[in-house]
Amino acid sequence: MKQHRFASHTPEERRRLSNLGHIVEGLLLGAVGVLALLESTGVASWAATAWPILILVAGVLLLILIYPRHPFSDWPAIWRDAQQQQHTIMAAAIAVAGVAELLRGLGSVWGYVWPGVMLLIGGMFLIHEQHGTSAAAAKAVWQHRILGLTAIIAGLLRAAEVGTGSSPLAILWPLVLLAAAAQLVLYREPEGAFEIGHGHT
């Protein structure tokens, strides 16, 4: 894997890499939503194992996109970057959720990890750090807040489904997750992102 210094990326490269990351994660979470629907509707029993594996893959892949592509000496700087710190926490939480879903057979408490992670990620999107011009940051913040609210709704629905065993909720939360996945796939960093300054509104 070719490595690049974290600080060497141009704004254009950072926008391109960010867009790619959003698309890849969106496609993976979209696949999770589809597989969860196949499980909940009884179409494919094997999907019950497949979608937790995909959650784990999504978390690990995001960590790979953030860290191993850069020299180990750059990792502390990556962690100190507020936006990348949030991405790191999200990625680790997603990976943990994948493992927890695979362990659900050991106890029902594991079933609350994935919805908890969706709530965590949704909350982090509401306060997501953005780099760039004021106009670019404001636009990105607005898009991430909508995404965050969608993730929170999906998490609440999944938690309610785990607690009640409701069949309608088992169908509803993957649909909301698909809406969040679509937002990720369609997201593009606005012009001016990563150009100057940083912050959120």
Give the residues covered by each predicted segment.
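Peripheral, non-catalytic segments of secretory and membrane proteins
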Residues: M1-T201
